Amino acid sequence: MRETQKSMTAHYRFYDRTLDVRLPHDLLRQWDLLYGAFREELDAPASITVVCSESDNGRVVLDVDGRSRKVARESVLIYLQDVVQNQVFAAVRTHMLWHAAAWNVNGNGVMILGESGLGKTTLSLAEQVSGGCVMSDEIAAWNPEKNLLESFPRAMAVRPTTFMFVDETERYPRLHLDEEKAIVPLARGQAAVPLRKVVILGWALDEPVASGESICEVNVSAADTQWQAALSEAVGGDVVFNVHPDGGGWWRCRSLQPIPTLVLESAITVSGGFLIGFHREARRRPDYSRSPVLTPLSTDDAVKGVLSELLNARQWMDAESPAYLLGHVRSVLSTAHCFACVPGRLAETQEVIRLY
């Protein structure tokens, strides 16, 4: 195996964790569109090292701390993002990192939690375009020592079709991640703020599930649909695969046989694919023609929702204790206004998040 020609090593710091990546120049330039704000010009030992090497048939080998995996070249950035989220962010000890957007609204921190596809980036783009201060559309970084919400200036990765919802021309560089995205930078060096509001975004459910029917939705990065035949064989019955009505690489799978998550992941992996997203219900992206639906949350309900989106929960439970984590989160949320929101019309949803 030979290292890819014209490669370069770059060093990145994510709080108390560091990452070295060695990539071809073109891939490194793309990676820096997303994570350039975290790059350091230092020659220091890294927590994790990733090296990209040439293979055959247009594929490459990614070596992550001595563990290798062969992937398609166009999937390198997807795998790198997976490494960052599951091995770097998950190991951060100085901050609590949530899968959430973070805004600074008049000096007050707003954390907007929700799974991928619920509109965190769309809402954040609308907030930034209208003159608001977006600290992150993807990671809300909480400093428990200072009790402050800090900025996480990874650039926003925006679907080109999203620009039709905001008063903004799509003039940004493109990058192919799970799908083609426009890369919109965030301001660096933003001030930390106290957390005053927590919003948990929820799905609008689509099709009902028939009695005895198993349904799931998956987002798969794969060269073909071989994983579908592998999944049908693995569950021992016919599985109906329909392109999700929202598109974006998602499939809706229905079967009269149970579809265990591990069986699904195995079928995708052995077929050379990569599981990006997974739901157990028939869900739809936000409908921007309807009004948002708001539901006040008790502190207990807010704590449950917030903990489910904490990327480094295991690290905090191991380093401190589950009781410490629960107590700290409960204390923080007890002074914040917490509510659930099924997003609707964009400007209206943005406004209620700011003012409700």
Identify the residue ranges that each predicted region occupies.
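Glycine-rich, often acidic-flanked micro-motifs
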Residues: 2-10, 16-30, 101-114, 129-236, ...
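N-terminal "assembly arms/tails" that initiate or stabilize quaternary assembly
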Residues: 33-40
